[in-house]
């Protein structure tokens, strides 16, 4: 099956690799795409694992998973990347995630901040 992150790759060749081993994620954009796919699959464990410990919403995990299951994920558009390459330790990715909730088309438009620590990328927060 095609990867839900809209990379045009197969899931097994894309976000499944990250979902299996987060250390395989090489860029901030790849982590952001893998997190989008984790929302599509309501993979709360990965969403928590890929969220930086300083901002990780552990107490909201059940609600996040419940919400992720309740919407129909339609599309991810990556708009802009700043740094976040394999050689970097920080970066930002601006994106739009389009989904349908209660019959209405909705959109999350965010510029996300990422940090790489000990070779592993993490989502920190929205700027």
PLM regions: where:
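Short amphipathic alpha-helical segments with coiled-coil-like heptad repeat character
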Residues: 22-23, 55-58, 120-126
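Surface-exposed, charged secondary-structure patches
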Residues: 67-107
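Internal alpha/beta loop-helix hairpins
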Residues: 24, 29-57
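Short, low-complexity N-terminal intrinsically disordered segments enriched in polar/charged residues
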Residues: 1-34
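Short solvent-exposed beta->alpha transition segments
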Residues: 49-78
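Short beta-strand edge/turn micro-motifs at domain boundaries
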Residues: 106-127
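Beta-strand-connecting loop/turn residues
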Residues: 1, 89, 119-120
